[in-house]
């Protein structure tokens, strides 16, 4: 990251986040890159997403073949169930795809839900970290940014919460990511689907 935002362009003094409605001028190369990213989430993830690994710290995201297939599946299907072992990188690729989704679609709502609120917030935190390390010219300006939610200037929002029947009551969501759903007790899972299914 070589770009620097001046203090007036920063969201609440964070030098890694662009404030909403900050004017931007794009080079021809940047316009080409944006077009490629809009068309292909795998291109975006490979070229503009950084993740934290235990061994190497912050590094560019190098997808495995199964993660590329997951992205294709998400992008081409309304409903997807993934059954994968722990520590396989499933949550990381889903978070990367959700970042692409909110960045390049206007006025969409996304919920990240997990068996515990702390898990959901950790997932959102990983998405936020990836966002902060994107080039500023690619970022949407930030309207709201905290441990439980974010809102971008394009009107797209993400919320993180524990899975329960009341977790996202009253909202309509374009995408709901349910992590660790196997650990949700059956009675809560049933109530959750009864209240949430009509919203998607």
PLM regions with names:
Residues 2-200:
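Phosphate/NTP-binding elements of NTP-utilizing enzymes
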């Amino acid at each position: 990251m070589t770009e620097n935002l001046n203090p007036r362009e920063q969201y609440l003094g964070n030098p890694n986040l662009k404030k909403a409605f900050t004017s931007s001028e794009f080079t021809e190369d940047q316009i080409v890159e944006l077009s490629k990213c809009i068309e292909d989430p795998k291109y975006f993830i490979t070229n503009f997403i950084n993740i934290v690994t235990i061994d190497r710290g912050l590094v560019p995201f190098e997808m495995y073949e199964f993660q590329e297939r997951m992205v294709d599946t998400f992008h081409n299907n309304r409903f997807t169930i993934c059954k994968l072992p722990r520590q396989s990188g499933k949550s990381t690729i889903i978070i990367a795809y959700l970042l692409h989704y909110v960045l390049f679609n206007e006025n969409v709502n996304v919920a990240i839900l997990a068996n515990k609120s702390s898990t959901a917030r950790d997932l959102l935190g990983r998405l936020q970290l990836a966002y902060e390390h994107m080039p500023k010219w690619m970022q949407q300006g930030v309207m709201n940014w905290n441990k439980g939610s974010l809102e971008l200037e394009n009107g797209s929002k993400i919320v993180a919460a524990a899975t329960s029947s009341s977790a996202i009551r009253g909202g309509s969501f374009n995408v709901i990511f349910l992590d660790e759903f196997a650990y949700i007790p059956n009675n809560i899972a049933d109530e959750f689907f009864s209240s949430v299914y009509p919203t998607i």
